[in-house]
């Protein structure tokens, strides 16, 4: 298709209608992919240690299960690198369809993996491979989803709000994952351990089908279409972004530490801490997290909207400060032993994370020039999964084992918050500015 033909095609497109479709497709897609990815984190603390490492001490088995959990995070930057390349060369839409299919396949296959009792250590090995494939798909998803929505935004003044909707998918996916696990938790302990936990993984195939149908019906973004028409695509965008904007890639990863580390402590490690240390039931923890995610995904677009008013960077630094300090309040409430206060701590735990989530998508994506944006935003975003998100449950378990106090974990969260504040301060703020061409000169 020539540049003239591409221009004519988009002249006939109702931009408002396409924006709605793009936002819906992005949000539904990220919800499905995060359901798939976070379902694993929910189940890890409940059953995987018992099923795949039954001969280990319970604490060691839990840490081994979280090690498999970490494999998915190692794969995410690789997925961002691979799909960032295709997203910046072929298009956002094509890359997003591929990520959805890849993640969906891996998640469905998890439900079929035999336990240690059936095939020995091979069960854990297969789980590692599937978790790696799943991580590659999720790693390539975020950058494309945000760009699909943000690059259809009609004005610069609402970009933070528009870009925040794909972020909605993470708490919404966690909400659905916890609902699915809770729904089947009426089974006896042995039944849930034997086959009940597998059903939510099987059900993911239905959601993938819905997401695929929606994504097939959307147009490519006008920003990428112009790049394609003007023949400005980078030859190797995932490599070029490290040459042209290495600082932004690194700062993006560091800026996410205040969100990634506590986020996985509050949503994954809490199942181990809650059942083993607090003596809480599985259903109690799941119910509290369902309330937590409901509050969380309501707050995301509000925080995104506020970033359009007060500035992306300022809003993000407020969120990082909130996140860094909240850990002490969280573990103080858990330490009271009161069921009501424990429930309150869990229910409120995602509010600081979602305060970061709202402005985060626009803050990161706006930092990269359009022809390298999928690669730069995706790789920077997913590198945080290695340095903060993936190791967080493992580090939290190790800190508690060493110090026997939740406050040790709170200090870890505070350190992550400080790092994120400094990183955000060093990023340029592009709020309300034209992002068709991003200035990559030094500050």
Go through each PLM region and give its residues.
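C-terminal ends and interior cores of transmembrane alpha-helices
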Residues: 101-119, 321-337
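Helix-loop-helix hairpin linking two adjacent transmembrane segments in secondary transporters
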Residues: 170-215
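Multi-pass alpha-helical transporter architecture, strongest
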Residues: 211-218, 415-441
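C-terminal transmembrane helical hairpin of 12-TM major facilitator-type secondary transporters
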Residues: 313-359
